[in-house]
């Protein structure tokens, strides 16, 4: 008897669940109808004007003049030969010490502040 009660409650629960899902679906459809009435062109596929379609098919290369100038600069850089780094130039390998630095030259012009 208890198994029958359990199955009855499960069926009632599933029925209520189905009813609530149907109500939600009806509400959503109602909202969609309201929106379509308010904004009729919203659900259509984007077609646009003939001018827009022509521009899209053409395949615009540059977004603005900055993109054009950057592409132009890249073209110039490819044409120029790139000089390799100087092999005799040492950068960052040697840490100078006070003994390695050349002596400071004294200034010919004397300061007016020094008494």
From Swiss-Prot:
A single Gene Ontology CC term: cytoplasm
GO MF annotation list: phosphatase inhibitor activity; protein phosphatase 2A binding; protein phosphatase inhibitor activity; protein phosphatase regulator activity
Top-level taxon of the source organism: Eukaryota
Comp. bias intervals (Polar residues): 1-10, 104-115
PTM annotation, UniProt: Phosphorylation at Ser-65 by gwl during mitosis is essential for interaction with ppp2r2d (PR55-delta) and subsequent inactivation of PP2A.
Pfam families, A to Z: Endosulfine
Protein name: Alpha-endosulfine
